[in-house]
Amino acid sequence: MSTAMNKFTQTISKPATILNISDSEESGDEAGVGKVSRTTQSSERWLDLLIEKFQPSLQNITRYINWNFIRICNDRLKKEKMGYIEAKQYVEDMAWMVIASEADSIEWKCIRRQEKVTGVKYPKFFFVQHKEDWIECTGCIPYPGHDLIYDEDDDD
């Protein structure tokens, strides 16, 4: 167990590598360590696009994710026995929330259909700025160049 934890700690301690940790428990030498899944690559690319769009306000977002991931591991992995995949998801959710707060002057876009196509899941219940009103839209994150989309046939 300590060997696996040491490998995991080394992996997450490298700058800008948090989103490179695989979501698959079957890949890598130890579960979730080593290989990059297709979903994770997509998630990493979305983060890159958002950072480019919202520069310079988000220039430290990767550093924030790394720092928070280590903090969450320390606080939750040991005390609450949260698995590293759950801890990773929690920190990614936190990062999207930071993006939301940093970019609140930007018009928010829904990428619900993109989420369905890629299989990449994003945090739910973001507040979306649209036509000068704040409205709640399940599954929304900012996505430059896309219109706000509501799928009327969605149950969730």
From Swiss-Prot:
It is found in: Host cytoplasm. It comes from the Viruses. GO terms for biological process: symbiont-mediated suppression of host cytoplasmic pattern recognition receptor signaling pathway via inhibition of RIG-I activity. Coiled coil: none annotated. Keywords: Apoptosis, Host cytoplasm, Host-virus interaction, Inhibition of host innate immune response by virus, Inhibition of host RIG-I by virus, Inhibition of host RLR pathway by virus, Interferon antiviral system evasion, Viral immunoevasion. Plays a major role in antagonizing the type I IFN-mediated antiviral response. May also inhibit viral transcription and RNA replication. Belongs to the pneumovirus non-structural protein 2 family. This is Non-structural protein 2. It comes from Murine pneumonia virus (strain 15). The gene is 1B.
